[in-house]
Amino acid sequence: MKGFLLLLSFMTRIPMPKTDYDEEKLGKSMKYFPVVGIIVGFILLFFCIIFNFILKNISYSAVLPLMIIVVILTDLITTGALHLDGLADTFDGIFSYRSKHKMLEIMKDSRLGSNGALALILYFLLKFILLFSLTIESREAAVYAIITYPVVSRFCSVVSCASSPYARGSGMGKTFVDNIKTCGLIVATVITLLYTIGMLFMPFILFTNYSLPMQFMIRSVLIIVIIVGLLALFAFAFSKLIERKIGGITGDTLGALLEISSLVYIFLFLVIPTFFIG
């Protein structure tokens, strides 16, 4: 529990009781990173519900863009832009096309470069467009994606930690890389699959008169398993690509992967179901 509280306080801006820092416990708690995503997902849902209630008398088409902005801003505030900072730093370093040592130096620089700025602009544009498109396609699917993408994206970070060595001799990310084991990856995988599949059945739990054809439910579970599997492969490939560039992963690349995989997840959620229609 202490390790998880440390992880939650480190990875979010959620007020937490003061806990003595323990590097080993923090590192070993990485397997529970998807649980942090569950908490973030429900925070996003909560603010969506509040915002929708406040503006319930305004037309849906007018509220939708604002709702998506609320989701993006809530995510940003909840995490303190920690992972976005990693995204910008990673793009500044990798796309400098310098030596491994120089790339790592650039990534440690707190100043925002042109590549990092471009990455952030593209990230926000893509996230808005993808969430908007998914909501137009299906409101239910959009709500599901909002409460699950924080989980799956954090699962990808766990996959990365288990896939590649740490690029530097020291650093916060090294704590997670050194302490994540195969059993930790299995725990994170089980949590992710149980949650993403379990949320499909939530309407049945909340509403006793809610029913859907069994074939539809089986197909939905299959889609989720495929998407999570593809994201795991993406995380592995991303980690190996970064490893070739700088000799391993860093805390910045973990943050970059988290944010990029959230976009890939929403994109796959738009595309993969089309192969099962008919």
UniProtKB/Swiss-Prot annotation:
Cysteines joined through disulfide linkages: none
Cell location: Cell inner membrane
Topology in the lipid bilayer: Multi-pass membrane protein
Transmembrane domains' residue ranges: 35-55, 62-82, 116-136, 141-161, 185-205, 222-242, 257-277
Pathway: Cofactor biosynthesis; adenosylcobalamin biosynthesis; adenosylcobalamin from cob(II)yrinate a,c-diamide: step 7/7
Pfam families: CobS
Catalytic reactions on record: alpha-ribazole + adenosylcob(III)inamide-GDP = adenosylcob(III)alamin + GMP + H(+); alpha-ribazole 5'-phosphate + adenosylcob(III)inamide-GDP = adenosylcob(III)alamin 5'-phosphate + GMP + H(+)
Gene Ontology BP, a term: cobalamin biosynthetic process
Domain of life: Bacteria
Cofactors that this protein relies on: Mg(2+)
Chief location: membrane
InterPro entries hit by this protein: CobS (IPR003805)
Function: Joins adenosylcobinamide-GDP and alpha-ribazole to generate adenosylcobalamin (Ado-cobalamin). Also synthesizes adenosylcobalamin 5'-phosphate from adenosylcobinamide-GDP and alpha-ribazole 5'-phosphate.
Protein's recorded name: Adenosylcobinamide-GDP ribazoletransferase
Organism in which the protein naturally occurs: Fusobacterium nucleatum subsp. nucleatum (strain ATCC 25586 / DSM 15643 / BCRC 10681 / CIP 101130 / JCM 8532 / KCTC 2640 / LMG 13131 / VPI 4355)
